[in-house]
Amino acid sequence: MIHAARSLAGSRAGPLLALLLLGLATARAEPVDGLPLRADGDGRWSLAAGRYAGNFVIDRPLHLRCEAGAELDGGGHGSLLTLTSPGITVEGCRLRNWGRNLTELDAAIFVGKAASGAVIRGNDLRGAGFGVWLDATVGAQVLDNRIEGDESVRSQDRGNGIHLYAVKDALVRGNRVSHTRDGVYIDTSNDSSIEANRFEELRYGVHYMFTHNSRVTDNLTRRTRTGYALMQSRKLTVTGNRSIDDENYGILMNYITYSTLAGNRVEGVRSGSTGDAMISGAEGKALFIYNSLFNRIEGNSFADSALGIHLTAGSEDNRIAGNAFIGNRQQVKYVASREQEWSADGRGNYWSDYLGWDRDDDGLGDVAYEPNDNVDRLIWLYPQVRLLLNSPSIELLRWVQRAFPVVRSPGVRDSHPLMRMPAAEPRP
């Protein structure tokens, strides 16, 4: 059944009725009844232009389409639309002024566990709470929505644009998200796909936690504090994404295993005004790999950033080849006690600062590329040593390393550096 609520736009009682309806909306969510819906047949309903106040539950299969000028107002409390039945589509609606209580999971559209197969398409959401929350449901699709947070609220007090919790087989595609906390947060949600979204002015663009067998494809992050934060997950496929002018990290891998990063482009990562509290040392890293093993990292481009790639905390047994490191202020940071070979099947990476030669013209450098030496390690441990970079003592240390390789510490070695930038990595 659909119980009715009256359009504020068409009411003659004016502001008094508006306040009354807004007050009632704070008390409880009602079935979407007296919204003046027009039956279009085959389970499809249209909502005419106007401003409608309340918190509503959709508890049966239907396709709700809002006509141009239709706006739902949540009165500043609770979730605006709550979906509790399979087979619901919400399309083309403008949603405003829902609650901002993150503990209560206030969202513009809350998709409950029973609402399997929900489709949230082409809506315009603007508010401080969560945009779309998918809660332990199956087969939901969030497509082509525009979601904007409230810049007047501190970033950490805003909701995420799209939040997946314990969800399976979700598709998030074609959305534009800005000024929320994270663009899309995926928690304990397997077999999801995040495709062709645009995330700007956020904490993290894409944030994975405890999620497996999922895809992140063809997304763009811009001016976030971390473009792609991939954490405590395995078997992720991350391809064709771009990170432009993000702070701290372009792609962060934290406890990631058996995953693929291919064909991604990261450029212009800079040091943030504040570091990331989770892992110290956010120096503008295009790629940061922390305690991550058995991953394939091939065919990516990391360019024009403060630091190209940083490996630490036991990040070993990763296949790193066919990538391009271009114009980074520092290409590699690696401090560990084990040698790392960054080439595979006789093919290494392209390094814009490689000074070797290719006498047989096979496209591979004849001299290995070794970006780190004992002097680099000394500078990482004691940054004040930078003041002595051009001093005779530093030059003597470098000469000793070359003359007596036995004193060279383990580090990164690319035995087959590429002389030319590689072609884009084909998609898996």
Swiss-Prot record:
One of its GO terms (cellular component) is periplasmic space. The complex may be composed of an ATP-binding protein (NosF), a transmembrane protein (NosY) and a solute-binding protein (NosD). Keywords: Periplasm, Repeat, Signal. PbH1 repeats lie at residues 85-113, 115-136, 137-166, 167-188, 189-210, 211-232, 233-255, 292-313, 315-353. InterPro entries: Carb-bd_sugar_hydrolysis-dom, NosD_copper_fam, NosD_dom, Para_beta_helix_rpt-2, PbH1, Pectin_lyas_fold, Pectin_lyase_fold/virulence. Required for the assembly of the copper chromophores of nitrous oxide reductase. Could be part of the ABC transporter complex NosDFY. Belongs to the NosD family. This is Probable ABC transporter binding protein NosD. It is found in: Periplasm. It holds the Pfam family NosD. Residues 1-29 form the signal peptide.
